Amino acid sequence: MKLHIGGKKAKQGWKILNIQKNENVDFVGDIQDLSQFKTETVEIVYASHVLEHIRQHKALDALKGIYRILKKNGKLYISVPNMDVLCEAFIDKNLNKTQKLHVMRMIFGGQMDDYDFHYFGWNFAFLEDFLKAANFSSIEKVENFDLFEDTSSFEPYGYKISLNLIATK
């Protein structure tokens, strides 16, 4: 199985886990509790702009949960807002007040519903440490995944705001 955590749009060959039910969601649930999935049953997990929506002290357990459900040599494709880039964008003197507000919403979440909040800012060093602590190996930084049309390839104001990593079990 290929599991898209936080997805909304159906794609052939993929199952969707989302905290909010909609017509394309196969599993309603939370990245923090993957108990509905058996150990080593998933080939690939894709999670774009999901990890920042949980509290930092719960992130390691969430990553360990993903590790548990992945098959041997399974892959985690993970994308998070890159705090280093977002901070650089926010202090850019060429951005106007409206653009800076947009960047700030990328840092703190859009806050359009009860789930659209960011609890933690990730950069490569932090995420790499958490992935290693969850026992992932071969952590590779990539420009994009070319799997879904989502925020992982978003470049507002010329800033590539996503940190995209592939981690192997």
Mark where each language-model region is.
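Short linear motifs at secondary-structure transitions and domain/linker junctions
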Residues: 1-8, 20-23, 95-98, 139-145
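Conserved SAM-binding loop
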Residues: 2-86, 165-169
